[in-house]
């Protein structure tokens, strides 16, 4: 019985870790997009850089 509980705890911690690492690139994209917006440019998510809006 203790083994099952331990297994559940380990998997839930791993899931939480996976979710947080999954979310951080999204946050980075938002930050980068905001930086590009301040320069009057558009954000290219594929190449992760600021580009002129009309070229995209």
UniProtKB/Swiss-Prot annotation:
Location(s) in or outside the cell: Secreted
Expression by tissue: Expressed by the venom apparatus.
GO cellular component: extracellular region
N-terminal signal peptide: 1-25
Threonine amide modifications at: 55
Primary subcellular site in the record, as a coarse category: secreted
Modified residues (Pyrrolidone carboxylic acid): 26
Domain of life: Eukaryota
Annotated keywords: Amidation, Disulfide bond, Pyrrolidone carboxylic acid, Secreted, Signal, Toxin
PTM entry text: Contains 2 disulfide bonds.
One example GO MF annotation: toxin activity
Role, per record: Probable toxin.
Family label: Belongs to the caterpillar 2 family.
Protein name: U-megalopygitoxin(2)-Mo9
Organism: Megalopyge opercularis
């Amino acid at each position: 019985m203790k083994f099952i509980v331990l297994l559940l705890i380990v998997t839930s911690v791993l899931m939480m870790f996976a979710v947080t690492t999954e979310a951080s690139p999204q946050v980075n994209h938002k930050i980068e997009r905001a930086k590009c917006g301040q320069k009057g440019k558009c954000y290219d998510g594929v190449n992760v850089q600021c580009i002129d809006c009309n070229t995209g």
